[in-house]
């Protein structure tokens, strides 16, 4: 391909609209200035994780939610809300995106005890005090677009914007805290939206929007303005940025015939066009980072061509019936997966990636670059990709039984897994992970081992899927330091608290998965007062009754000695100290009976003993480094952070 064409392709990928965009791009991330002591950090982080785990289903169910978790000065107050013009799908996606960013304010990152993230589609906040009735705070922001209106339309635009701001502050209160509309006079249109958070009563909404109207006045000659307050959100723009426009207009005579509407939540997908000027700004301000991303995209394109991995975007559209909901197999924080049938009759799984931020580049590059270079019976096989359409697509072999999570906890039309199948699934998963860690040409940490990422073939051979969060592990490092990414409940304590990543983080995740499969129960360590299945198994192990933890649906139809051995291995994998967890190759040998099983010496994560251990880990410098200097040059620092809701 000519170099000019390739460059145009790359630029097009950065600025093309995506039908999957949910206005999730961050407008502002604000971390407060209240710090916490090292002794309290682990408990505060634990309460934060539980609160985040609990607030997500509330937002998914009704568009907003608040959660209080913990006691005393370690209490975490959490809140999330979507802008009311978003449909449910876009609300869920938007919230997943900003939820991934708020941990950057956590004590192990910034040393603070509160933070909030504003996007143009949703909002999230956590703090160590009850902020639910706040209308204003010292951290409120006014954000004006850098470009001003010029020429003969400047005065008209300013007047229209001022009128619209007045309309929004009045009509939103009348309409239950939400208003979206526009003013169009003298052929100049200004669009706007205002919303009070559900935590405010009517008087609080009036106060918040009244103050927002004053603050946004400083932006009236700019192309766009926003006010980000503790109790409300207000925005105007030259562009229509909301869904299903209302009819709030002013006629050319300057009358006051304003009709406010509450926009209905729709099933349409949000189209959020990245402006060319914004793309140019990013290219100038982040030149080095864009060069890296271009290099990655060029590598992807050459890799796809060299290995015959290229698929036509149009063919994949037709194969999935244009991404019909009836063909949808599932959705995570990085994209949706659809069943498709190619023209040759082959059934495939097509992953449709969301790429409205830099994150899609890393995720897509990881998937194609890593999984195309590994080959194992327990890894999902990548068949190809498409990077020539409006969004990036990955094509995998189709696994009929879907995920282990669905088979255990969702599907009601299947027989429960018997003991032999559970053993086969656990062993196959362990063998696949041992290959990734030690046997492949690359040293790969998956970072997101969980039930929903284990797919099952017809004969129940497990396949490890989703390499979007995977990391290559340098041969000359004992660990790398990275922002946390993964799934709550499966992440190792040293990774949650310090961002310290080794293969042993995957081992911990495997241990959780292993115990979940054997017990038929999910690990609820991050749900307040729910208890942890890891703690339950440990307690039974201490009293020599560990076989009682086996899924009761099996009755007596399982090998008690074998079950006890596997649960003991699971406990070894979830020990609080990472250096006491076995390597995956050792796990495989212990499962096959060719190696003695050691005795766990520590309780699993989140019981009192492990909390003490976490405190020690946070207060003690790391000693397991590639040299004794302790220099930060021993680390590779990664900036991205990504959570997928469970």
UniProtKB/Swiss-Prot annotation:
**Which segments does the topology annotation call Extracellular?**
21-260
**The keyword Acyltransferase is annotated on this UniProt entry:** no
The residues annotated as the active site are 448 (proton acceptor)
Q: Which residues lie on this side of the membrane: Cytoplasmic?
A: 282-646
Quote one Gene Ontology molecular function term: protein serine kinase activity
The record's comment on protein family reads:
Belongs to the protein kinase superfamily. Ser/Thr protein kinase family. CRK subfamily.
Its recorded name reads: Cysteine-rich receptor-like protein kinase 3
**Which organism's genome codes for this protein?**
Arabidopsis thaliana (Mouse-ear cress)
């Amino acid at each position: 391909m000519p170099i000019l064409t390739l460059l145009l392709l790359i630029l097009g990928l950065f600025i093309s609209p995506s039908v999957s965009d949910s206005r999730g791009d961050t407008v502002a991330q604000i971390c407060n200035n209240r710090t916490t002591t090292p002794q309290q950090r682990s408990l505060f982080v634990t309460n934060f994780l539980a609160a985040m785990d609990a607030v997500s289903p509330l937002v998914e169910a009704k568009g907003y939610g608040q959660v209080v978790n913990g006691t005393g000065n370690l209490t975490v107050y959490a809140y999330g809300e979507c802008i009311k013009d978003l449909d449910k799908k876009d609300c869920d996606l938007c919230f997943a995106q900003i939820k991934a960013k708020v941990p950057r304010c956590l004590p192990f990152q910034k040393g603070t005890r509160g933070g909030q993230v504003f996007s143009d589609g949703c909002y999230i906040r956590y703090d160590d005090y009850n902020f639910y009735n706040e209308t204003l705070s010292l951290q409120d922001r006014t954000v004006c677009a850098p470009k001003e209106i010029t020429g003969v339309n400047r005065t008209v635009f300013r007047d229209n914007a001022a009128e619209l701001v007045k309309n929004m502050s009045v009509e939103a209160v009348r309409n239950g805290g939400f208003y979206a509309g526009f003013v169009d006079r003298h052929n100049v249109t200004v669009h706007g939206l205002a919303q009070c958070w559900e935590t405010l009563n009517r008087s609080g909404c009036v106060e918040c929007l009244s103050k927002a109207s004053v603050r946004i006045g400083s932006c009236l000659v700019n192309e766009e303005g926003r006010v980000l307050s503790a109790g409300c959100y207000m925005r105007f723009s030259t562009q229509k940025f909301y869904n299903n426009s209302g009819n709030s207009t002013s006629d050319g005579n300057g009358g006051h015939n304003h009709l406010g509407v509450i926009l209905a939540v729709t099933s349409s997908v949000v189209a959020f066009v990245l402006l060319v000027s914004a793309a140019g700004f990013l290219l100038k301000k982040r030149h080095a980072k864009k060069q890296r991303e271009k290099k990655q995209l060029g590598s992807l394109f050459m890799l796809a061509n060299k290995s015959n991995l290229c698929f036509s975007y149009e063919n994949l559209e037709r194969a999935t019936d244009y991404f019909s909901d009836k063909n949808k197999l599932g959705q995570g924080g990085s994209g949706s997966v659809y069943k498709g049938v190619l023209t040759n009759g082959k059934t495939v799984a097509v992953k449709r990636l969301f790429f409205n931020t830099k994150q899609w580049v890393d995720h897509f590059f990881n998937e194609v670059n890593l999984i195309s270079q590994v080959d194992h019976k327990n890894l999902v096989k990548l068949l190809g990709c498409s990077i020539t359409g409006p969004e990036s697509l990955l094509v995998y072999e189709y696994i009929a039984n879907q995920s282990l999570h669905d088979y255990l906890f969702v599907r009601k039309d299947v027989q429960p897994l018997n003991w032999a199948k559970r053993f086969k699934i656990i062993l196959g998963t362990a063998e696949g992970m041992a290959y990734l860690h030690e046997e492949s040409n690359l040293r790969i940490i998956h970072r997101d081992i969980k039930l929903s990422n284990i797919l099952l073939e017809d004969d129940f051979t497990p396949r490890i899927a989703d390499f979007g969060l995977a990391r290559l592990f340098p041969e000359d490092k004992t660990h790398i330091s990275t922002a946390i990414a993964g799934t709550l409940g499966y992440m190792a304590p040293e990774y949650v608290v310090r961002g310290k990543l080794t293969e042993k983080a995957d081992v911990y995740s495997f241990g959780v998965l292993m115990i979940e499969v054997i017990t038929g129960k999910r690990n609820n360590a991050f749900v307040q007062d729910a208890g942890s299945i890891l703690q339950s198994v440990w307690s039974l192990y201490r009293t020599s009754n560990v076989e009682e933890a086996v899924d009761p649906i099996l009755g007596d139809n399982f090998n008690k000695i074998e079950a006890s051995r596997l649960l003991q291995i699971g406990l070894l994998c979830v020990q609080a100290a990472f250096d006491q967890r076995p390597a995956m190759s050792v796990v495989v040998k212990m499962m096959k009976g060719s190696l003695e099983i050691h005795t766990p010496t520590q309780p699993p994560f989140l019981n009192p003993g492990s909390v003490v251990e976490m405190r020690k880990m946070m207060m003690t410098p790391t000693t397991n480094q590639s040299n004794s200097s302790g220099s930060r040059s021993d680390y590779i620092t990664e900036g991205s952070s990504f959570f997928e809701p469970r």
